[in-house]
Amino acid sequence: MEITCIQNELLQSATYLFDGYLVDCGDSAKIINALDGKELKGIFLTHCHQDHIYGLEKVLTQFPHAKVYCSQKTWEGLKDDKLNLSYIIPEHSFCFRQDKNVVVLNEGCHTIDGMEVEVISTPGHSEDCLSFVINDKIFTGDSYIPFAKIFTKWPTSNKSLAFENEARLKEIAENRNLKVFPGHWTR
């Protein structure tokens, strides 16, 4: 599984592309360019904060059959610019309305188009956070960023849960020898 990291401009968030899937959805033009005419099957969302979702509507306009995989709380946050914090940067304000695309995932193992996906609920940075284990990779969003401290000052943050889940993800990654793909990139 080859993974391409798309470095988004907004808050240096990261979007990952592999085998017709995305993890998070930032700069739509960069994403569409990286797909280079290939099919987009689905988008896994780690949480609903603006810097991880702001390209969603434009990408789904280009790929209307792609599914959006997320937690129930992320789904609720996609529809509310206060919950997804997009009201903070008005030019990226976002309220999602395309519910036919959304597949709510609970913690556990799922088979999606023949691909095994382990979903881990990791609230803390935000109450809706999920991490995804696919093959020997773990996509941690903002729940575990090896080179940065977790930000826990949002309205739905929980500092103690954030640190607990960060330690849990670090342990899972180390014990299972998983390569970590966090929700932000560094220069």
Residue map of PLM features:
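A structural micro-motif
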Residues: 1, 38, 63-66, 115-117, ...
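Conserved beta-strand hairpin/beta-sheet module of binuclear metal-dependent hydrolase folds
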Residues: 1-36, 131-145
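Short acidic-hydrophobic surface loop/beta-edge motif
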Residues: 6, 18, 107-114
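Short Gly/Pro-enriched turn/cap motifs at secondary-structure boundaries
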Residues: 6-7, 100-102, 120-123
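Residue-level marker for buried hydrophobic side chains located in beta-strands
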Residues: 21-23, 44, 68, 139-140, ...
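Conserved phosphate-coordination/catalytic loops
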Residues: 22-26, 50, 160-163
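Active-site HxH/HxHxD metal-binding segment of metal-dependent hydrolases
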Residues: 27, 32-109
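Metallo-beta-lactamase
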Residues: 116-187
